[in-house]
Amino acid sequence: MVPTSYYILLSALLFTLGVVGVITRRNALVLFMSVELMLNSANLALVTFAMARQDVAGQIVVFFVIVVAAAEVAVGLALLVAIFRTKHTTDVDEINALRG
């Protein structure tokens, strides 16, 4: 069996990679993917801790987090497509949707 610390280390590395993606990239689609990577790394850590405690509640919470993340992606991508159709760019520095 793989030790719990390996899963936590993998989760931390994935979360760090997601944070680096959010900080360095300006493409809205890449930002969405980086945020999803961060959510999935948090899910991995939560499942790891639930597995270590032999508790199913952590896995149930992760299931609901995945459902909410899927809804977030659907709304976010719909907004991104609408913005791309009007502005013809996905660069977050050039998108000023509130300015009109």
From Swiss-Prot:
User: Transmembrane region positions?
Assistant: 3-23, 29-49, 60-80
Q: Provide this UniProt record's keywords sorted from A to Z.
A: Cell membrane, Membrane, NAD, Quinone, Translocase, Transmembrane, Transmembrane helix, Transport, Ubiquinone
Q: Where is the signal peptide?
A: none
Main enzyme class: translocase
> Catalysed reaction(s)?
a quinone + NADH + 5 H(+)(in) = a quinol + NAD(+) + 4 H(+)(out)
According to its UniProt record, where is this protein located? Answer: Cell membrane
GO biological process assignments: ATP synthesis coupled electron transport
Query: InterPro entries annotated for this entry?
Result: NADH_UbQ_OxRdtase_chain4L/K (IPR001133), NUOK/Mnh_C1-like (IPR039428)
User: Which GO molecular function annotations are given, in alphabetical order?
Assistant: NADH:ubiquinone reductase (non-electrogenic) activity; quinone binding
Q: Which GO terms describe its cellular component?
A: NADH dehydrogenase complex; plasma membrane
Q: How does it sit in the membrane?
A: Multi-pass membrane protein
Q: What is its EC number?
A: 7.1.1.-
Q: Which family does it belong to?
A: Belongs to the complex I subunit 4L family.
Q: Assembly and interactions?
A: NDH-1 is composed of 14 different subunits. Subunits NuoA, H, J, K, L, M, N constitute the membrane sector of the complex.
Give the function comment from the record: NDH-1 shuttles electrons from NADH, via FMN and iron-sulfur (Fe-S) centers, to quinones in the respiratory chain. The immediate electron acceptor for the enzyme in this species is believed to be ubiquinone. Couples the redox reaction to proton translocation (for every two electrons transferred, four hydrogen ions are translocated across the cytoplasmic membrane), and thus conserves the redox energy in a proton gradient.
* Protein's name according to its UniProt entry: NADH-quinone oxidoreductase subunit K
- UniProt lists the gene as nuoK
